[in-house]
Amino acid sequence: MKTLHERPDYVLRFDKPKNTEIKHINGRWYLYERTTVYDPETGRSTKKSGRMIGAITEDGLVGKRVEARALREVVVVEAGATQYLYRENGDIRRLLGEHFPDCRRELFSLAVIRMVQDRALKRAEAHYETSILSAMWPGLRLDGPSLTGLLRRLGRDRLSIRAFMRSMAGGGDRFLMVDGHRILSASATLESAEKGYDSKRRYKRQVNLLYLFGIGGDGRGPRFYKKFPGSITDDGTVEELLREAGVEGEDCTLVGDKGFYSNENFDLVEELGLGYIIPLDRGSKVLEGEVPPSHVGYGSAFSFRRRSIYAKRIEGEGWVVHLFLDPHLLAEESADLVARLENKNAGLDKKRRAEHKRRAKGKGRLTEAELAALEEIPVIEHVGDRRVMGTIAIRTNRLDLNSNQVYAIYKERQSIEQLFKTYDCTYEFDASYMQGDFAIEGWLFLNHLTMIMAVRVLDMIRDLGLTDVYSLDDFTQHLRKIKASKVDGKWYPTKVTKKVQALCENLGISLGSVDQIIEQERASAP
């Protein structure tokens, strides 16, 4: 039986045209065409509904919009990660505008794309077209030929690159860490790619990249880089790096690694008026006769990340050496040494047994001296007085710092180690196919921008105590799932999964209006 619905006042007031009828469907009222058709079999005329004309509302008849909906513009793009990086890196956008006004949008877009999507420049244009970047800055030319020209122009302008990096540092860093990194190159036209050894003992064509990493009131991050030919070692490049970066003044302290230790480098940092915190080799003459036989002789102790650290102070002229004993490190090094000696003894025993079997058959190969050399190594005697195991010695001219502070600052070198780990593993920036030194200079600057953004995300995760929960990959892969849809000229956020929503809540990420960003960028366009 057909259900009758009570018609509201606005339907009753509606002036229904001739040859039409009103229907109630799913709680709404619609106007349909109606025709009369004669049926010859029954000899009667029957009413037949035609197409829907429109919906009847309180404002009157709203015409059918099926055709309009089919033709209206609907665009879906990545918005989450890009929107976050846009809001959190306003200083980068501002300084790019100051130093690279003609290509600031391209540079920022490429840095974001390479962090969020793909490091390969050949796919940058495709990612740009499916990102909210294409709505913020329409018409950017990121095709292959355009990017080749951009990198070369950028690489020729080392002065602007240097000015940008100096501006980013801003003089607020209290501590600067210096370290080198090697980038393999397959390019035969790259003059700075020369054969040399790196930390992995690879003797290949490579570029030596030296980096300064800052820690100060404005947070942490990569501050300055300079490339050198691959045949040049790090200790021969530090002076040029520091002078070009404009590093000087007693308010800044340089934190180096063991490769930095040399009298020339100490003279350099003192000439620049810098403080320094530099680790020494365990065989350094300064430590002769100074290493206590046990932790009792160290004089002081403190805890660091739930580990007991013992410390001894060795005074010098204008400097001091802090000698540290880490019992946990001592146990690890002792276990490693004993294991290596045991493995070596097992190998000696195998060779000794084989020789005895051959001699039993009258086929011995070794001399008596060679056989005697295969005798088992007394493990405990070989370990002997290894009092330097588990120790770290650090020289500094910062006489105002105590042992606890010096140790904590030096351990921040893990920051730059994390930087290069991200450089290699996450973004695979350790090999370059750039053709020419200008192109690789531009490529390195793009890497630098991306790494600034990445380190800021890592620091945000670390400050929240969530490094065991979220990685940089988790951040980018989840946030780039947040899309924005453009319907009839207006942007709307799409629904997100529970995992994405949980990440945003845990990291305190709240994304604002996409339209607001687009309007802001259009207003600032030249």
Model-predicted regions and their roles:
Residues 1-177, 181-189, 211-231, 239, ...:
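Dynamic "connector" segments at or just before major functional cores
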Residues 41-42, 120-123, 135-137, 185-188, ...:
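Short helix/loop capping segments that flank catalytic or ligand/cofactor-binding pockets
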Residues 118, 164-229, 350-388:
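Active-site cores of enzymes that catalyze phosphoryl transfer or operate on phosphate-rich substrates
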Residues 165-166, 235-252, 263:
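Short, basic/hydrophobic alpha-helical segments
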Residues 224-227, 272-409, 477-526:
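An anionic, glycine-rich sequence signature occurring as long contiguous blocks
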Residues 255-264, 282-285, 438-439:
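Acidic, metal-coordinating catalytic cores used for nucleic-acid/nucleotide bond scission
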Residues 405-434:
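Short amphipathic alpha-helical "interface-anchor" segments enriched in bulky aromatics
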Residues 436-458:
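Basic, amphipathic alpha-helical segments enriched in Lys/Arg and hydrophobic/aromatic residues
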